[in-house]
Amino acid sequence: MQVKYYESVFKLDTLPLDAIHVIDNWYPKDNWVQFNNALKVTNRWSFDNDVTYEDGETTEITWIMRLFRKWMKPAGNYVEFARPVIEQMCNDFGIEFEQFDFAGINGQTQGLQGTIHKDSFRPRNITFLWHCNTEWDNNWGGKFRVYQKDTLDKGHRGFSEELVENYQIAEIEYKPNRLIIVDGSYPHSADAPNNKSGYAFRKTFVARGNVAKLVDK
């Protein structure tokens, strides 16, 4: 699947998605700063974000701040600072969720390697992934990876160099205020910060739904 890079927003014109869309400098700077100021004082992180397969094996546990559950049900009274982010995602790209499934912030430090998983099995799904950190060094790692659609069906799980070499179809660097729009039925993973990153905390704001439609906004 092709990766397309942009410097400004645009209206999506096809579902299922026919490309991985990457928008740099996405969120307005003042809003981005306001969001991160609110995030810093919202102490709702939990260390129980896992990837567990059908046979019960768990291959990933990372930090997570849960924000909205299915049908945009708030996870608590602390989440409203994040609602405008989701609204802007939908408005900027002409999307309406007919079935919204989840929003939250994934967090990784050194050693918390993301492992291969899918977000959806439905054709008209959308996953938004916003790199919400305000600072990130190019040498810290943290790449987002996408794999061939049938990789999990072939029994692959976890993360390995073999997986990257034989099944990876896209690799996108972590960059502050970068937004990725991807078909969540493609397996994907996120690298942890590497050993050059010190105490860096790699954060990704995730909003996804199993069923979306294009609207003219």
Where are these regions (language model features)?
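Non-heme Fe(II)/2-oxoglutarate
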Residues: 2-96
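Catalytic core of non-heme Fe(II) oxygenases with the double-stranded beta-helix
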Residues: 87-217
